[in-house]
């Protein structure tokens, strides 16, 4: 089931959800918020700047420059190139598959719940977020996907690409 919340940004919804968790009793959080690609990265950067420190934020991207420009201290470059996916989900999917061990290691620190946020319709979020969700679920982590899809004016091709990504993501959350 896909639900849309037209009056609120997905990052604001996630901020409100996370604020309800309160402070953990220990320093290492069992909750990870993982931003994948440009859209997911923007959402995580926003939440991080809002001052939520009760979770561990992670950025995953095929674009090394986007990772370096972020204030979020934990990042994972997907693939070896670091030049982005060029709006090609299959390229991002391959980069994520190439980085499976790094993804597993990122999730292996006691993570019990993962929120994976991504913008669908481009390359990295659409292609890599489902791979990260699959790994998370295979590790027994409660995995929640929070994604956006393009506006109608962005065109049918981009929307179709986004819906393919949502369908793939839904298999793992």
Label every PLM stretch briefly.
Residues 4, 8-173:
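Tubulin/FtsZ superfamily GTPase core signature
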């Amino acid at each position: 089931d896909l639900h849309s919340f037209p009056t609120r940004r997905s990052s604001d919804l996630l901020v409100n959800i996370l604020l309800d968790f309160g402070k953990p009793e220990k320093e290492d959080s069992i909750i990870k918020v993982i931003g994948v690609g440009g859209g997911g990265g923007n959402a995580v950067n926003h939440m991080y700047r809002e001052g939520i420190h009760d979770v561990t934020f992670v950025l995953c991207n095929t674009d090394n420059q986007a990772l370096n420009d972020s204030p979020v201290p934990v990042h994972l470059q997907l693939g070896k190139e670091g030049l982005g996916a060029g709006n090609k989900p299959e390229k991002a999917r391959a980069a994520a598959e190439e980085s499976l061990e790094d993804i597993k290691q990122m999730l292996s620190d006691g993570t019990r719940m993962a929120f994976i946020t991504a913008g669908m319709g481009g390359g990295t979020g659409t292609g890599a977020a489902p791979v990260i969700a699959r790994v998370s679920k295979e590790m027994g982590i409660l995995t929640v996907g929070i994604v956006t899809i393009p506006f109608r004016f962005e065109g049918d091709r981009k929307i179709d690409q986004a819906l393919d990504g949502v369908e793939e993501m839904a298999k793992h959350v």
